[in-house]
Amino acid sequence: MEFFMKKVVFALTALALTSGTVFAAESGDGTVKFTGEIVDSPCVLSVDSQNQEVVLGQVQKSVFAAVGDKSPAKPFEIKLEDCDTTTMKKANVSFSGVGDADKSDLISVSTEAGAAKGVGIGIYDNSNTLVALNGGKASVDLSKGQTVLYFTANYVSTLATVTTGYGNAQVDFNLSYE
């Protein structure tokens, strides 16, 4: 009988230890996506700078009384990290995209229904000089470690009469070194 009792106790103990996993409920699953790039350049583009959104906000139509009038500037930056200045000394940034029909060195706002007309978007470097779209560039001397390129963006009137609407746009940037 003692042998039988030991077998029963062992069986009940084994059942108790494994029953938690039998009755465990799944709490869900998901996906982990890894992205990145291996580069051979003097600096690495900061993750914070790779995909940005600059909110120009709502601007009163009355700000644009004449061609060339600008909305308040909104800052943004492109941050470079792990910079090695032994081979290259300067970073250049250029912007490419759809140019405004009336002033091609400005970015065209979307032409979708409900879009504003008579304005483009200008990007200006740290010295408040327009970085012409599709050809201009901003340059900065590299610093060992981190280098930051500072910019501002604003709406610029391209026509004497501006119509209200959305002022959305997208532009790509390219880094080069010398």
UniProtKB/Swiss-Prot annotation:
Species of origin: Escherichia coli O157:H7
Main location class: other
GO cellular-component term (any): pilus
Induction cue: Induced during the exponential growth phase.
Single biological process term from Gene Ontology: cell adhesion involved in single-species biofilm formation
Function noted in UniProt: Part of the lpfABCC'DE fimbrial operon. LP fimbriae may participate in the interaction with eukaryotic cells by assisting in microcolony formation.
Leader sequence residues: 1-24
Lineage: Bacteria, Pseudomonadati, Pseudomonadota, Gammaproteobacteria, Enterobacterales
Name of one Pfam family that matches: Fimbrial
Name of the protein in question: Probable major fimbrial subunit LpfA
Keyword field: Fimbrium, Signal
Location relative to the cell: Fimbrium
Similarity comment: family membership: Belongs to the fimbrial protein family.
